[in-house]
Regions:
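Small-aliphatic-rich amphipathic alpha-helix that forms the alpha element of a beta-alpha
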Residues: 27, 35, 42-83
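Short, surface-exposed beta-edge/turn micro-motifs
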Residues: 23-25, 68, 93
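Conserved residues at the C-terminal ends of beta-strands
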Residues: 30, 73, 98-99
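Glycine/small-residue-rich phosphate/adenosyl-binding loop
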Residues: 1-54
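Short, hinge-like loop/turn segments at secondary-structure boundaries
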Residues: 15-17, 87-90
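C-terminal helix-cap and adjacent tail motif
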Residues: 94-122
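Short proline/glycine-enriched turn/loop segments at secondary-structure junctions
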Residues: 82-88, 105-108
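A short, structural micro-pattern
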Residues: 21, 89-92, 110
Length: 122
């Protein structure tokens, strides 16, 4: 989405996360639940996994190119769909603004590997 008025309305539909409207574009990541592999152990839909992987790869490559992104998962899906005329059979999984950052993010210390990884059992 490049249109400024639409970006501002998407920011409003994203629980008033207005910073996203400042990016040159907002990517709206969608999937087709009816056209996906339906057997993933009945605990997860493959369309969501597929779209999430695609968005994450996009975000990693954007970082490599010096671009900034931010996964936006908090939004009113029906409002987003109405704004963009997204068909009923299509689900919106995430939004991400994309552009060159205005500032460097502040450093946040990372957890030690032992704090987040388990071996052999939880």
């Amino acid at each position: 989405v490049k249109n400024q008025a639409l970006k501002e309305r998407l920011a409003e539909a994203s629980l008033r996360q207005y910073f996203i409207s400042k990016a040159p574009i907002i990517i709206v990541a969608c999937g087709f639940p009816d056209n996906c592999y339906s057997r993933m152990g009945n605990y997860m839909k493959s369309w969501a996994v597929d779209v999430a992987c695609a968005v994450e790869h996009l975000m990693l490559q954007a970082e490599e190119e010096g671009l900034g992104t931010c996964w936006i998962g908090a939004f009113e899906e029906m409002e987003v769909k109405a704004l963009l005329n997204i068909p009923e059979n299509v689900k919106v999984l995430a939004l991400t603004p994309l552009g060159y950052p205005d500032e460097e993010p502040r450093y946040r210390p990372r957890k030690e590997l032992e704090e987040i990884v388990s071996y052999d059992k939880y």
